């Protein structure tokens, strides 16, 4: 099967790839890394002092045209059963199927086979497929 290319492949610009970490999470073990907005009256991060960690704001948002776009130029479409890849039949140059995490390995095989018949690419075709010798 020839490699499908996306209709348009815009340049994806990530304004920031590092995670935003919580203030003083590097200092204390009990404070997790997950971002929380600082709300203290004297907090240096909230007041945006020079040299402090950065806070997320609207300026870091992705471009609307390239948001949720894979590096290959396609977008993901979550598939839960064998009938859902047929939705992508007319737009297989802009979308790729991704099998949901809660689909059984038996149904995964069927979805991958059906997608191959319809010339639809799957982003995770080999996930949770067991070899024949293990069965």
From Swiss-Prot:
Q: GO CC annotations?
A: cytosol; ribonucleoprotein complex; ribosome
Coiled-coil stretches noted in the UniProt entry, renumbered to this chain: none
Q: Which domain of life is it from?
A: Eukaryota
What is a single molecular function from GO for this protein? structural constituent of ribosome
- On whether Membrane is a keyword of this UniProt record, the answer is no
Q: Which UniProt keywords apply?
A: Ribonucleoprotein, Ribosomal protein
Q: Name the Gene Ontology biological process terms.
A: translation
Query: Pfam families recorded for this chain?
Result: Ribosomal_L32e
Q: Identify its protein family.
A: Belongs to the eukaryotic ribosomal protein eL32 family.
* Protein name, entry field: Putative large ribosomal subunit protein eL32'
State the species of origin. Mus musculus
